[in-house]
Amino acid sequence: MKKFIYIFTILLVASCMPNKKKSNEINIYSQRHYNVDEIQYENFEKLTGIKVNVTKANADELIQRMKNEGNNSPADLFITVDVGKLWQGGNMGLFQKFEDESVFNNIDPQLLDNNGYWVPLTYRSRVIVYSNERVEKNELSTYEDLSNDKWKGRLLVRSSSNAYNQALMSSLVENLGSEETTKWSESVVANFARNPKGNDRDQVKAIAAGQGDIAIVNSYYIGLLLSSEKEEEINAGKSVSVFFPNQGEGERGAHINVSGIALTKNSPNKENAIKLIKYLNTVKAQETYVNNSYEYSVNPNVKPDEIVQAWGEFKKDPVDLNSLGTNRNEAIRIFDKTGWK
């Protein structure tokens, strides 16, 4: 009887222990909402047989969810469109370091994380677009010049709560300092054509509708408009031209930000997750990104889509990308202080 009880107890304990057997899948927490991502995952599944499960939400919600889940989080990978959120997750201890020279060798060194917690997938620039009818290219020069009185009532941009604007402001804090950036923001707010609203596409549509003459937008949105199936969006895209700021001699270059991927600290399917990181780093996957989302490849040998190539090459701001995270709170403080809604 005692022997029976002993065996029963062993079996009961074993049944209650967590199942360590790795499943043939990966779980992604992703902020990205682009169709190209689904194409990438489908191609990866066909190639490897590994099922890709994706949970989508905004970055702050996903970060909080991983924090709450702790060691029991099912997430293997975190993907976001902003370095600031990648830095935040790494700083909170949610990620583990990723080290693979075979991946890093395919990436522009300027785009790499100095702390080793995330890998860039694509990048884009936050550019100025201008009306082909009401603005001459030679009127534009730098981000700093957007504070000039000549743009009063002519500048369109989305709200300060948007991560893209927060990243741009963070880069200005890094390059100019808080005092100069605050002065800049005050003057820029005074130049708004309307209170900030809508997304980047909406700023371009507003230019086409004559509600403003210039706008601050992410570069790839112009590609998305020009390749749209909607006539209104195509016409909006055609109504503007792209300008990369701060390109003159001795100037720092245009602000950039990345979409990136991070391996979670307690990834339950680590081997599979690493396989996906490596796949998204391949030339094939990078070409899929640029030809469908109109972003720039992190691989210098992968050319942009033809639409993007037409804008010409540009000089990138060489600032440490993690400063877009470390300066984020100061950027938000400046937004609030200067009335950028």
Language-model segments: residues:
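Short beta-strand->loop
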Residues: 29-32, 114-115, 130-132, 138, ...
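Early extracytoplasmic/lumenal segment of secretory-pathway proteins
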Residues: 17-87, 341
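A structural signal for short loop-to-beta-strand junctions that line the ligand-binding cleft
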Residues: 73-78, 96-128, 144, 154-157
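A bilobed periplasmic-binding-protein/Venus flytrap-type ligand-binding module shared by bacterial periplasmic
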Residues: 127-134, 256-269, 288-291
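Extracellular/periplasmic bilobal clamshell ligand-binding domains
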Residues: 306-341
